[in-house]
């Protein structure tokens, strides 16, 4: 998932024997995903898992011994794995919050239910955008993100008024990324 442009792969690429590496910051626990097809999956917790300051990294066992000798111990996955991810003092409060979020997700019905809710949120928003002449989404439907939905108005001069009206209705932080403008709705699990 790429958050600025609101695109994501609609499939897991087949890369043969080459280890596939992915940043799952926005996709972690958004729906069931087959992580066994990846060599490395990493991501910050701040989108779907918890507060900023915590990273979740999954490394396939056969890749642990491939670190270069000049890699500092803190970034050497082999060393981290040998120390049960406790080479340094872990961010305990962030891990505690991650645990609470995992409990909440189970209470919602688990990953299948979270995925169904996220798909419904995204579908509803895309349908509203696509059925209107007032809004536009630049991403081809097959490559659209479930988590980050960029859109523009037919008249960009209305952007400021739209954002103010949205804020009055309780919809905040919709301003698009500075590099692309427009609007962007981030609809992570907690939304």
Regions found by a protein language model. Name each.
Residues 149-155, 171-191:
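Conserved PLP-binding active-site segment of the aspartate aminotransferase-like
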């Amino acid at each position: 998932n790429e958050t600025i442009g609101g695109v994501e792969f609609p499939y897991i690429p087949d890369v043969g024997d080459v280890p596939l590496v992915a940043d799952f910051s926005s996709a972690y626990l958004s729906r069931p995903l087959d992580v066994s097809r990846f060599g490395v999956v990493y991501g910050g917790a701040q989108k779907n898992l918890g507060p900023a300051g915590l990273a979740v990294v999954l490394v396939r066992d056969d890749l642990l011994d491939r670190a270069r000798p000049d890699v500092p111990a803190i970034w050497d996955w082999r060393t981290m794995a040998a120390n049960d991810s406790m080479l340094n003092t872990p961010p305990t409060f962030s891990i505690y919050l991650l645990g609470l979020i995992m409990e909440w997700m189970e209470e919602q019905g688990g990953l299948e239910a979270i995925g169904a809710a996220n798909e419904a949120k995204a579908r509803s928003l895309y349908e509203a955008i696509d059925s209107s002449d007032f809004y536009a989404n630049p991403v081809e439907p097959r490559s659209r993100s479930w988590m980050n939905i960029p859109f523009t108005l037919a008249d960009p001069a209305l952007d400021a008024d739209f954002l103010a009206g949205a804020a009055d209705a309780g919809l905040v932080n919709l301003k698009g990324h500075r590099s692309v403008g427009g609007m962007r709705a981030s609809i992570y699990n907690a939304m």
